[in-house]
Amino acid sequence: MAQAMASMTGLSQGVLPSRRADSRTRTAVVIVRASAEGDAVAQAGRRAVIGLVATGIVGGALSQAARAETVKTIKIGAPPPPSGGLPGTLNSDQARDFDLPLKERFYLQPLPPAEAAARVKTSAQDIINLKPLIDKKAWPYVQNDLRLRASYLRYDLKTVIASKPKEEKKSLKELTGKLFSTIDDLDHAAKIKSTPEAEKYFAATKDALGDVLAKLG
């Protein structure tokens, strides 16, 4: 009996070390496999990054070459002449000419005296046509249109007056001074949104316009 127990004890002691060795071997194999798989994944990632970088470099080189070809095909001529010489653009460069005083940088196209007189009549009619806006109390529109037409009117009247003989200039200047005084009063009435004042100065402006147009003939 004792011998049997001893033999079993010896057998168990011999089996345990062998099992431990097997488990250690398996663990080592798993570690080696995991390390190999990790290296493979890292290598694949590096290859993908290198491929993307190479693609970007090639694409950039191709796009630069295409742009260079496009630039070669664009024909650049001489700069355009000042003011272009087209109708309505004779003073187009004056607004950008910083050597000129601000008041001399026109945004209105200068016209010959006869054409300026015709535009005076058009601007006068546009001012008279503001009456419906006054009746509707559309004050911002009244102010904007009045100021726009008055700027044309002032500019063209200066052109017309400058072309008149000396004896006619004085009377025309007096009439235009009265006209723009009433226009300023009408603008102020629209600013304060006063219907009675607007109607009063609109009538005065209309009469002053009639006097100026009659003088121009």
From Swiss-Prot:
It comes from the Eukaryota. GO terms for molecular function: calcium ion binding; electron transporter, transferring electrons within the cyclic electron transport pathway of photosynthesis activity. Gene3D superfamilies: Oxygen-evolving enhancer protein 3 (PsbQ), four-helix up-down bundle (1.20.120.290). SUPFAM superfamilies: Oxygen-evolving enhancer protein 3. Coiled coil: none annotated. GO terms for cellular component: chloroplast; chloroplast thylakoid membrane; extrinsic component of membrane; photosystem II oxygen evolving complex. Its main location: plastid. InterPro entries: PsbQ-like_dom_sf, PSII_PsbQ, PSII_PsbQ_pln. It is found in: Plastid, Chloroplast thylakoid membrane. Residues 1-68 form a transit peptide. GO terms for biological process: photosynthetic electron transport chain. Keywords: Chloroplast, Membrane, Photosynthesis, Photosystem II, Plastid, Thylakoid, Transit peptide. Belongs to the PsbQ family. This is Oxygen-evolving enhancer protein 3-1, chloroplastic. It comes from Zea mays (Maize).
